[in-house]
């Protein structure tokens, strides 16, 4: 939990938040506090869900990113705009490549349980389920710099 006064202003070179921004109620205050904690050359590295990602394209509203706990949702354009508006520059937004065993992808994919159970058995017997599989499933990352005062 980020609390005001926990760290001195300008304390950090880099601040990372992975799947955090989408859960913050007062995002404007949070990003202002993050910015104040960065030193003058400080950078951020965030990862969030992508509303234009593959999971949304394949699953629509059934995509796991549409969750009551996700207060804010972003795509590359909206994340870039939000950060620039809040004093960040040199913003680079990019897709994240996720690598998990085929078992994981199968378990989270919304298919009928009877089919899923059969596929899991096949994957177990054949050992296919342990094969790592990489996919740009619907996460984006961003690296940005604290904008210098002009």
Segment roles from a protein language model:
Residues 59-60, 107:
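A generic structural signal for secondary-structure junctions
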Residues 88:
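Short phosphate-binding/catalytic loops that engage adenosine nucleotides
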Residues 92-150:
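A C-terminal cap/extension of S-adenosyl-L-methionine-dependent methyltransferases
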